[in-house]
Regions:
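Hydrophobic helix-and-loop "lid/oligomerization" segment in the mid-to-C-terminal part
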Residues: 2-119, 139-140, 188-401, 412, ...
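Conserved phosphate-handling catalytic cores of large alpha/beta enzymes
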Residues: 112, 122-135, 143-206, 212
Length: 538
């Protein structure tokens, strides 16, 4: 395990120190929660607003492509709410993907071409859909797009608002919903409305859900104000999925993952109902239940795929793997595999002579892969969709073999400590500052140096005996979902007394139960290193 401690055990750290260490350039500005990039710094934003205004005044039907992830649903539902605020009688027709596609894929294109040409709005996608936009333009369509993905080619066929191509915009880590909000704010300014500020909850949640960096003061501004007073359309989702909690972690494991489950596994009708519930047009209780059921199904299906349907084709510096059945869960499965192997994963499924799927990596990878061997690699540097021809797979493997090395994944940790050396203040540090932790500013975790422990000191808890707990130096150490393999390594079923060596990374905090407050460490199981105990005499 290669670790990089940020601090020494003798350091006393305050949140300002930690923010600076993570990469916040101006901590005082960041903590004021008041910074926003000027909407006028966005290229083409005035033209976008004019085309939208003309569509309203001419009573055109507006077609809105709802991209197939949380950021896509947030941007589109926010835009729908905004449009109906400024022009109550506007006619907006949402278009939904059939799966986890993005932008103007072939199926969406066939649907659009059935309609009478009008205005098409594409949010959180579309930057590189040059061929599709050219075809639609020739048929009489007008296309306006607000996106945050990197531009790979010039697109003269749509009006594109994008933070990546706007040289005056500082925040390159804003979500698609954030860029869409900029358009709404610009429309407010240009035509004398004041509705955009009330919609920042959509941006805050999308920034979390799409893994946007919180090192930028603008994203912290959206988080701070967007979660202080959740928009009434979104409150039922936040209350049910998050248990009323509004820190980034609660969103990531609550509302974000549940909604993404429906987007992956739900029917077209489910997606439509979810969209209108996020818009506040229908009551959300039923679709919230559907999200929960599909999230449970997603967990079961991911586990089953990993155990039964994934074959590793090549295990080198990068793992190439194939899933034998069609599934929308390649991203989740690849993420699990990355945690297990601690190296980049390219997981695909066969579609004729093409292999399509997902890439997950602990290092920046997208730009390392040779574009001439892939049909596309679309997304972020460490998480993106991929496609290549089967005939290219050998060349891809040869290319990976030719790489001298990849950067070794490094685990950045708050401190590296012995169990006896943990400063008391660290147990309250996370709870006191949890609102600030997110992408780029991770929850502080501690690396625990190797120590020996007897199997008889370790407890198995819970009805399924899958929770592991042991007590050491005044701290309760816990991890969940213990596998049979780990039970064997820990000798938990052995009758004889055996000693093992443990090393791991964990998150510190306090556990309160019936008025008792105890120190606790939740172990990150993907970092758990177990060996039979031995003494080195030389």
């Amino acid at each position: 395990m290669k670790i990089e401690p940020l601090y020494d055990k003798t350091d006393f750290v305050i949140i300002q120190d930690y923010l600076s260490k993570c990469g916040v350039k101006d901590v005082n500005l960041w903590l004021k929660h008041k910074y926003l990039d000027d909407v006028n710094n966005y290229a083409n934003i005035d033209e976008f607003c004019k085309k939208l205004y003309n569509a309203f005044t001419n009573k055109q039907k507006i077609y809105l492509l709802v991209d197939s992830d949380l950021d896509g649903f947030m941007s589109s539902s926010m835009f729908y709410v905004y449009c109906h605020s400024v022009y109550k009688d506007c006619c907006i027709n949402p278009i939904f993907h059939t799966g986890k596609q993005h932008g103007l894929d072939n199926i969406v294109m066939e649907e659009i071409k059935q309609y009478k040409p009008s205005l098409l709005v594409v949010l959180d996608a579309g930057t590189n859909d040059v061929k599709q936009d050219k075809e639609l333009k020739s048929l009489g369509w007008d296309i306006i797009c607000a996106d945050h993905h990197e531009r790979e080619k010039i697109n003269p066929y749509c009006t594109l608002v994008n933070n990546q191509i706007s040289t005056k915009v500082k925040n390159k880590s804003l979500s698609g919903t954030g860029v869409s909000w900029k358009v709404c704010k610009a429309y407010d300014t240009k035509y004398g409305f004041n509705y955009a500020n009330g919609l920042i909850s959509y941006v805050a949640i999308a920034n979390i859900g799409d893994g946007m960096s919180f090192l930028t003061p603008e994203n912290e501004t959206f988080r701070y104000w967007g979660t202080r007073d959740i928009h009434y359309n979104l409150k039922p989702f936040v209350c049910d999925f998050n248990g009323y909690l509004t820190d980034n972690k609660s969103f990531s494991f609550g509302m974000v993952t549940n909604i993404n489950s429906l987007i992956r596994l739900g029917t077209q009708k489910d997606k439509e109902i979810l969209f209108y519930a996020l818009c506040g047009k229908i009551e959300p209780e039923e679709i919230i239940c559907v999200c929960k059921k599909l999230h449970s199904k997603q967990s079961r299906d991911t586990k089953s795929l990993l155990e039964k349907d994934v074959d590793i084709i090549y295990n080198g510096k990068i793992i190439l793997a194939r899933v034998s059945k069609s599934t929308p869960l390649t991203g989740l499965v690849a993420n699990k595999m990355m945690g297990e192997h601690n190296k980049p994963i390219i997981l695909t499924q066969r579609d004729g002579e093409e292999l399509k799927g997902s890439v997950r990596s602990p290092i920046d990878l997208k730009d390392i892969l040779p574009s001439n061997l892939f049909n596309y690699n679309l997304g972020h540097q460490r998480a993106f969709g991929t496609s290549y021809q089967i005939s290219n797979e050998k060349d891809i493997i040869d290319y990976i073999d030719s790489l001298e090395s990849l950067p070794e994944p490094t685990q950045a940790v708050f401190m590296s400590l012995r169990t006896s050396d943990v400063p008391n203040y660290l147990f309250g540090f996370v709870d006191e500052n949890k609102a600030y932790f997110g992408e780029g500013i991770p929850i502080p975790k501690v690396h625990f140096q190797k120590f020996g422990i007897y199997n008889k000191e370790i407890q198995l808890l819970g009805a399924n005996q899958r929770t592991v707990k042991f007590h050491r130096d005044g701290i309760d150490f816990i991890f969940f979902n213990c596998t049979n393999k780990i039970k064997e390594l820990l000798h938990l079923n052995d009758l004889s007394k055996k000693r093992v060596t443990l090393e791991f990374i964990g998150e510190l905090g306090y556990n309160e139960f019936r008025g008792n407050k105890t120190k606790q460490c939740i172990i990150d199981m993907s970092t758990l290193d177990i060996h039979d105990y031995r003494i080195d005499f030389m």
